[in-house]
Amino acid sequence: IRYDLMEKNKTGKYFKYAIGEIVLVVIGILIALSINNWNEQVKKDKKIATVFETVKKDLLSDINEANEFIDYYEEKDSLINLVVNRKVTNEHYQLNPHLRTVVMFYQELSINKLGYETLKENINDVPTKYENALIDINLIYTNILQRIEVNNKSTRQLLERTLQKWADNYNWYRTSQETSQTPNDDMINFFLKDSSYLGDVRMVKMLQIDNHLSTAKVYKIKAISALIKIDLANNITLEESLKAYQNSIGSFEFINLKPIEEFVYKQPTDLQPIPVFINNVMNEKLFIYYKNAEGVDLLIPFEKNSIEPNTFDSFNLIKDFPFIVKDSKGNALGTFKTTHLYNYFNLK
């Protein structure tokens, strides 16, 4: 056609036709590039989805390990309190090997990092929908993980120092080691009457219970939050997410907050801390005002569209005791109280 137009001296039409061909070629190239870019993006999205599935798998595995870790140390804490408060008798030590070994054994908490390391390698390809999840994930694998590793090391070193001190100074310890820790009178007398033993037990409580156990609980709360946020980014509802992980995180009761008529703070007598997820669907930051177990006033911020507080520590309420929800101007939106062991609250 172009040749025919040139032969007939129709130069204007020739150039129009040529330009049209060029435009069509350019459009074709752009379409091809768009399709190629789309295909590449699909590949990246699939890869990122796989990476987050690995992160979720790691988190679930670590939550299960944290559950065992928490159970172990909560039982140990009850034994330590008996020892510190002088509630243990000779007979108790004779019959209960766990009482005799509150200082001698410990557990470490290990966190899987494979998924997180892979995520860091592909961080530039992560879609913005995962922004909320990344906040928790980065906190877990930097700040919290560092605390866990420090606690693991401190606990291990304390045990080594304490057992070496006992081996150097007490014949009963060397004898008990040779007889598979069979209790003897000197051992039990040391546990009952030596003030240095109480010091050893208190140090164990500080490192293993106050530090290690507390950090494990923070890890669990943040890990659950990260799981939920990954699911929310993929259009999985909060209800579906919590149900899917029920075996690992326990059951949650779904209720709406209902104001109570009176609001009178009373010091709880039977403390029962309640881990709480609060879903703030208001279009502004909200604040939860309440008293903790020690009667201290606390104000916890909840960003809009958040499902847990923007604080490092976990959020715990006392069962059947009230708290206030305030807006960003300090106006009270209502007074509420918990009614179940586990609660999921809608703020709306």
Identify the function of each model-found stretch.
Residues 1-12, 16, 37-255:
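Long, hydrophobic alpha-helical segments that serve as membrane-spanning/inserting helices
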Residues 19-34:
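Hydrophobic membrane-insertion alpha-helices, especially the h-region
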Residues 248-268:
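N-terminal low-complexity, Pro/Thr/Ser-rich intrinsically disordered segments
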Residues 267, 275-282:
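Asparagine-centered strand-capping/turn motif at beta-strand->loop junctions
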Residues 284-295:
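Short, surface-exposed beta-strand/strand-loop-strand elements in extracellular ectodomains
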Residues 296-320:
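Intrinsically disordered, low-complexity Pro/Gly/Ser/Thr-rich segments with frequent PxxP/GP/PP motifs
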Residues 304-305, 328-348:
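Structured interaction patches on ligand/partner-binding surfaces of diverse proteins
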Residues 319-331:
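Short, surface-exposed ligand- or partner-binding patches at beta-edge/loop junctions that are enriched
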